[in-house]
Amino acid sequence: MIKRSLASLVRVSSVMGRRYMIAAAGGERARFCPAVTNKKNHTVNTFQKRFVESSTDGQVVPQEVLNLPLEKYHEEADDYLDHLLDSLEELSEAHPDCIPDVELSHGVMTLEIPAFGTYVINKQPPNKQIWLASPLSGPNRFDLLNGEWVSLRNGTKLTDILTEEVEKAISKSQ
């Protein structure tokens, strides 16, 4: 059943002695691209679509997110992480038992909160996103939308999640 469904999405064609894959999905036009055989003699598609037009819950991704230039992504993400680091370091100085360690290196921030665990906030340049791994709220991905890092899954803002969870940790330690 699954194999049949996949076969209906992608089929291999032989045109003038060369192998090509016809790739089509979700209403987009079919594209011809060279097919390659891997070591297990399976045909694989060499075409990869970089962006999708809908989120994981089926909502349409705003054009602002899809058309974000990579340079602007890096500038905005680096600025956000630098400002976040400054804010968290101030909180760490005021509440050293609650937030003993905050580090930022090469686009990856780690935040240690003994009451909850370790947070990882990192850049994902291929997706132009910032990812959060939180011991409380779990993993989430954020896109730059209207100047804020927002989850397209549920509309939450990265700043709001971090503020809420850090405030919980501080109130728990007092």
From Swiss-Prot:
EC number(s) on file: 1.16.3.1
GO MF terms, alphabetically ordered: 2 iron, 2 sulfur cluster binding; ferric iron binding; ferrous iron binding; ferroxidase activity; identical protein binding; iron chaperone activity
Mutagenesis / variant outcome for changing W131A: Impairs cell growth, lowers aconitase activity and strongly decreases interaction with ISU1
Broad enzyme group: oxidoreductase
InterPro entries associated with the record: Frataxin, Frataxin/CyaY, Frataxin/CyaY_sf, Frataxin_CS
Taxonomy, superkingdom: Eukaryota
Subcellular location: Mitochondrion matrix
Gene Ontology cellular component annotations, sorted alphabetically: iron-sulfur cluster assembly complex; mitochondrial inner membrane; mitochondrial intermembrane space; mitochondrial matrix; mitochondrion
Its biological purpose: Promotes the biosynthesis of heme as well as the assembly and repair of iron-sulfur clusters by delivering Fe(2+) to proteins involved in these pathways. Plays a role in the protection against iron-catalyzed oxidative stress through its ability to catalyze the oxidation of Fe(2+) to Fe(3+). Can store large amounts of the metal in the form of a ferrihydrite mineral by oligomerization. May be involved in regulation of the mitochondrial electron transport chain.
Other known facts: Present with 1560 molecules/cell in log phase SD medium.
Protein name: Frataxin homolog, mitochondrial
Organism of origin: Saccharomyces cerevisiae (strain ATCC 204508 / S288c) (Baker's yeast)
Gene transcribed to yield this protein: YFH1
